[in-house]
Regions:
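Long alpha-helical scaffold regions
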Residues: 1-170, 174-603
Length: 603
């Protein structure tokens, strides 16, 4: 006890001295003496957070002391102050003056009514998304009949990439159930159906239907943008190009021009229109410069584009949002443009000295650096379109080099190297389109590839199997094209394929026949029997084909359910177990059914 008391005595003495010091300051100091050090701290460049916090605390309290008419009189000067151009110089700083003003206004009660367009501009320009959006939501609740609040909210949500919030906002705001249906289809990724729904709305409105004739202008624009957005997702660039020409949208026409290889049109658009300094335009200018072989100009445009993209990145919220994804994809495209310029230099040097360039490092990197499977189709299309352009250029140069006998003997596949890379990449693109439940886009992608590869020996390309598999699987997703898939497989020359590939084609035939059997009015007995024959052929050719085992097991299981013959239960059990042993993910979901079949076989 004594040591503790001894230790507490000095502490009590120090606290008493400090208490007397504070009392002397409070009794003898004037207001000026208190404000002087505070003013010095507030003007310290190293303490912006203190200034920001003090302003946000004091201004709402001062605002609350004003009378209603005084508050209303101050709104117009506030709007004028927030709209001053000199604030832009501080846009990249955090915190900045505009953020301080908006956070203080957000805490005011009642909140001043700042116009929606001003809040939208301030939120986007000064990285004040988290302040502008709550203010817009507050005013939208107070003034539900004023559409400008919803327009600004929609614009900010779209800029942040929050498609679900955008669709939710419009679902509450839309005046027609047809609009809500189109938005729901879009949210679920059913882009073909969503596009058709938007087109139907526009067609009915143009026809003057009474239900849609009084549609608000904002909703009409939503339909139009919905059609364009769906067309981009579905890779319909020819359609978008025609629309851009008719509606005089130069930036959309520029985007379509390079993707459809209309380089002359793209160059004319650059000279015809005044272009903003945004990363997307700089990327298009880099594409055009590399296409024309102007590598120095391409490097300058690319560097400018990267700087503008970094500025946009700094203008986004610090937390990860969906709008970061397009910028990351843009950085990858700029990286590949730099690598494209490097490849052009190597190809030019190879033509000058007559040697074979070594492009394997960059080409292997491109194979490994594809977008993720779940990324949206436009991100894939941007990369694949440019890569295909480079592959065509590579093939033209290597084709000329392959005419030299010593090069042709050293590298027999030199002339078709560009086509091999193109085919592999485009087939991968088609596969992703099919996985996104966009079979029409998959078929169109393969069709364009076939037009490019006409006249190239299939043995050099080694793409027959991959293209056919993607086309047939797309037909499986579109029941109306099942006969087309059967015709394609029947006409295929499979002798050059390996045994596992031949077995998989027989399995695909069985899948098509089972699909026909399920839709047939007479239960499709003939198609089902033919399907089992093809499955037996596939398994006899290549036993390690788990999906064939699963399909066969499913057919045996359905036969057992219909007739009750335990023999079919035994066969289904064996097929399911074999598929599980071959580690097919889908087969694991059949384990409960396997247990049920074991019980049935035991009885």
């Amino acid at each position: 006890g004594a040591p503790a008391s001894a230790a507490q005595a000095p502490l009590a003495t120090k606290l008493a001295v400090h208490r007397r010091f504070l009392a002397d300051c409070a009794s003898g100091a004037s207001l000026g003496e208190l404000l002087a050090p505070l003013s010095e701290l507030l003007h310290d460049p190293g303490a912006p957070q203190l200034t920001f916090a003090l302003w946000v605390t004091l201004f709402p309290r001062a605002w609350a002391q004003l009378r209603t008419e005084e508050q209303e009189a101050l709104v117009k000067p506030l709007i004028s102050l927030l709209s001053k151009e000199w604030h832009v110089r501080q846009a990249s700083a955090s915190p900045n003056v505009v953020q301080g003003w908006l956070q203080a206004l957000l805490a005011c009660k009642p909140m001043p009514k700042i116009p929606a367009a001003v809040l939208q501009y301030l939120g986007k320009t000064f990285n004040a998304w988290h302040l502008a959006i709550p203010m817009l939501e507050h005013h939208a609740l107070l003034y539900p009949n004023e559409p400008q609040w919803y327009d600004a909210l929609s614009a900010l949500r779209t800029a942040l990439g929050e498609r679900d919030s955008f669709c939710s906002l419009w679902s509450r705001r839309a005046t027609h159930p047809e609009t809500r249906l189109a938005l729901a289809l879009e949210q679920y990724g059913a882009w073909t159906a969503a596009q058709q729904a938007y087109v139907d709305c526009m067609t009915r409105w143009q026809a003057g239907e009474t239900v849609l004739v009084n549609t608000p202008r904002a909703e009409l624009q939503l339909w139009e943008y919905g059609v364009l957005r769906s067309a981009k997702k579905l890779n319909q660039w020819e359609l978008l190009s025609e629309f851009a020409k008719q509606t005089q949208q130069p930036q959309l026409l520029m985007e379509c021009s390079w993707k459809t290889s209309a380089w002359d049109l793209l160059k004319d658009l650059f000279y015809k229109y005044s272009l903003p300094d945004v990363p997307g335009i700089k990327m298009l200018q880099t594409y055009a410069a590399i296409h024309e072989g102007k590598l120095s100009e391409a490097e300058a445009r690319c560097n400018d584009g990267i700087q503008f993209a970094l500025q946009e990145w700094c203008g986004l919220p610090p937390l990860g949002v969906q709008s970061h994804t397009p910028l990351l994809q843009m950085f990858q495209q700029f990286q590949e443009l730099q690598e494209s310029a490097q490849m052009l230099m190597e190809l030019n040097n190879a033509q000058r000295v007559g040697s074979v360039p070594d492009l394997s490092s960059i080409l292997n990197t491109w194979r490994e650096r594809l977008p993720n499977t779940w990324e949206e189709l436009p991100a894939w299309n941007d990369l694949i379109s440019w890569r295909n352009h480079m592959f065509s250029h590579i093939n033209n140069v290597l084709g000329r080099l392959a005419e030299v006998p010593r090069h042709a003997e050293a590298k027999p596949g030199l002339a078709s190297l560009g086509y091999q890379e193109m085919v592999w990449t485009v087939v991968r693109f088609a596969h992703v389109a099919r996985r996104h439940a966009l079979p029409e886009a998959c078929i169109n992608i393969i069709a364009k590839l076939q037009s490019v590869s006409t006249g190239i020996a299939a043995v050099d390309l080694n793409d027959t199997f991959s293209k056919m598999r993607e086309q047939v699987r797309s037909c499986l997703q579109m029941p109306g094209l099942v006969p087309h898939g059967m015709q394609m497989l029947s006409q295929a020359d499979i002798d050059q394929l390996s045994k596992p590939q031949q077995a998989e084609l027989f399995q695909l035939k069985a899948e098509l026949l089972l699909t026909e059997s399920a839709e047939a009015a007479d239960n499709g007995t003939a198609e089902a029997e033919a399907a089992t024959a093809h499955l037996a052929t596939a398994i006899s050719m290549h036993g390690a084909l788990p999906k064939a085992w699963l399909l066969w097991g499913g057919w045996c299981d359905r036969t057992f359910r219909k007739g009750g013959d335990v023999v079919w239960a035994d066969r289904a059990l064996g097929c399911y177990m074999q598929a599980i042993l071959l580690r097919l993910d889908r087969a694991r979901s059949m384990i409960p059914r396997v247990l049920a079949l074991l019980a049935a076989a035991g009885q």
